[in-house]
Amino acid sequence: MFEKFQAAENRYDEINHRLSDPAVIANQDEYKKLMKEHAELEVLVTKYNEYKKLTKEIADAKEMLNEKLDKEFREMVETELKEAQEKLEVLKKEMKILLLPKDPNDERNVIVEIRGGAGGDEAALFAGDLFRMYTRYAERNGWKTEILDSNPTEIGGFKEVVFSIEGNGAYSRLKFESGVHRVQRVPVTEANGRVHTSTVTVAVLPEAEEIDVEINPNDLRIDTYRASGAGGQHINKTDSAIRITHLPTGLVVCCQDQRSQHKNKEKAMKVLRSKLYEMAREQQHNEIAQERKSQVGTGDRSERIRTYNFPQGRVTDHRIGLTLYKIDDILDGDIDEIIDALITTDQASKLANGAEDDED
């Protein structure tokens, strides 16, 4: 492990030297590439320097304990040594996590699809609540959101909404949101105050670039139609909405939220690329495909990754057994505590798998 950190430090020093080279500075593409690598290595180098500093403190303390010391001073050194050794164990775990293989999609933008499952109007209302939760979370992180397609209902909410989130590390933070989200509350339409259960499915896709997916124009059927709003009424007098069908796979994507047909086509192609990219990833990694299917499922009430219980003010993530009693804050975009816990569990699982591989 430490050889990898030493190699990272050597490369970091080399990049520092190259970044002062006028020829590199003049080549913007090369300069940006090196700056990105520099930033990634800096995290490793900082942690490695902490490790070297701590191991030196431990060695110095042990050497001091070999000398003749008065009782009070010896106890102080022994306490400091114990604390440093405990810090070192924590630091080693953090260093192992830093060496875990990175998900190549972590830094990508995302496309999020939210669809009402079981529960009719109430599911559509909760789809709207989740849309607001994710857009508020994006705002907190300084990320940009844009609706690509939506099917609003007359009483508020969405039958479905597709939107993009652009920002550094968006996929790394939101990829665990894919799945069935269950809500338990008294619907606004319920006269006698009974609690109903509804579900909403969420799918988070890493946004694909044009270079990631090659699409043959002959494989596409493109239809235009008039954009409609809640209840089906037409909101545009021209056929600006776009429906693209990818004939080889049968995938269909729509976009009607832009006034321009050209912009709607551009946004629809973005969604199609990301869906095809995800399909290719699933074929390459069958275990990921199985995991994703079990997460997203059918929208049936029995399948869930998270429950939002309004009467109790409770949100429970069933994958990790985490329960928080701050439903209003969470639906206002305060979801970092859940996301951090999911990432920590994922890292622990990868570390455990790595340890098993080492034993093999």
Swiss-Prot record:
Methylated by PrmC. Methylation increases the termination efficiency of RF1. GO terms for cellular component: cytoplasm. Residues 286-305 are annotated as: Disordered. Keywords: Cytoplasm, Methylation, Protein biosynthesis. PROSITE patterns: RF_PROK_I. The modification N5-methylglutamine is found at Q233. GO terms for molecular function: translation release factor activity, codon specific. It is found in: Cytoplasm. Pfam families: PCRF, RF-1. Its main location: cytoplasm. InterPro entries: PCRF, Pep_chain_release_fac_I, Pep_chain_release_fac_I_sf, Prokaryotic/Mito_RF, RF-1. It comes from the Bacteria. Peptide chain release factor 1 directs the termination of translation in response to the peptide chain termination codons UAG and UAA. Belongs to the prokaryotic/mitochondrial release factor family. This is Peptide chain release factor 1. The gene is prfA.
